[in-house]
Amino acid sequence: MRVAIVGGPGVGKSTLVRQLADLYHHGAYGEGEKGVWDPRVLADIEAGRNPVGVTAYFAQLYDANYRDASANDHADRVIFFEGARLTLEAHIAEYPAEYHAALREVLAIGDHWNPDRTIVLTSSTDTIEKHIRLRSRPHEEAEQMVGRFRLIDAEFRRLAPSYPNSVVIDRDGKEFHDRAGLDEIIRLAHLPPYQEIPYRVLKRYP
């Protein structure tokens, strides 16, 4: 089973991917960040430059992940991905209309990904601003990022119904470093149960 986790900037996608993958022990694919990406990408995103190149770059990152996972996906596994075709389409709204036709051509890269479930995370802007300030990335300016979030979040909400197996989840009040928060996401997304590794009081092993 392939589960994509998507949403606007600062909503907690990377954290949720890592945490759920650690619960299921079946693997995960993040989208990376500074240090993984070509160093020009962040500058171009911030300046609004090269929209087709930026979108194609992330599409190819996602495509490499989905292709690699296809060799490991089995009926009893739950593999998590940060990013989906929906991500590429939602971000088109960031760019001027003159680029939209070319950006839609890039979407074809993701036509074969077809995750079995797409979790669309949404949140209030107050929560997003708090998360962005807490992670304190040097290339991010909080007010600008909150503005980006509002725009992209609206697109995710609008587009989600057109993607099969997508579920929109408001993450406000759900802590991803808390088991109750993770269990709530699993319940809302209708994911299969994970196998708990028991903790025991031992004097000897085995």
Question: What spans do the regions from the language model cover?
Answer:
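P-loop (Walker A) phosphate-binding loop of NTP-binding proteins
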Residues: G8
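Conserved lysine of the Walker
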Residues: K13
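Conserved substrate/cofactor phosphate-moiety recognition/catalytic segment
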Residues: D22-R67
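Hydrophobic anchor at the beta1->P-loop junction of P-loop NTPases
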Residues: I5
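Pre-Walker A (Motif I) flank of P-loop NTPase domains
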Residues: M1-R2
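NTP-dependent small-molecule kinase module
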Residues: R133-H139, Q144-P206
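Hydrophobic positions on the alpha1 helix immediately C-terminal to the Walker A/P-loop
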Residues: L16, L20
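ATP-dependent NMP and nucleoside kinases share a basic, alpha-helical "lid"
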Residues: S70-D73, I79-P138
